[in-house]
Amino acid sequence: MKRIRIPMTLALGAALTIAPLSFASAEENPAPKMSQTTTAGTTAADVGLNVNLDVLGIANQIADAIKSAQNRDGFVKNLMESSFYASGQKYNVMVFNLSQEYEDHLNGVQFYGSAVYDGITYGIWVFEDGTFTNKGDGGWINWAFRGWFDRDGSTVAFHRP
């Protein structure tokens, strides 16, 4: 199979040049595994953190927060606080129990990952603005958010600082 190399450029705040891509089948060129190492030398995956998008490079701080959790509501609050401070206190943060129904319309997502506590998977979003509606149970054990927002019951409208 002949490989085609195409240089690509991505604009994200400032123009970033991405290395030329090589297109091949998955068997010839499997996708790389994301492995980020925390300050304690373990990887994000070792502590149950799955990172899908990390524009800000904050996965390590969040992974460290996961390791220190001792109870469920503390775990959720710690993910929220760690995400907020790791992102430079410039973005909104939502941590949500993904076993519950929700609706989100988030803009400018800078980070998305998921973390597991006692078999429960939580989504972690760091973003610019938008709305999030919790269609399940509330409370610190199920969701936490921080940033600039107006809340009306189970719907939170986030705005930029």
UniProtKB/Swiss-Prot annotation:
Induction: By phosphate starvation, via the alternative sigma factor sigma-B. Keywords: Signal, Stress response. Residues 1-26 form the signal peptide. This is Stress response protein YvgO. It comes from Bacillus subtilis (strain 168).
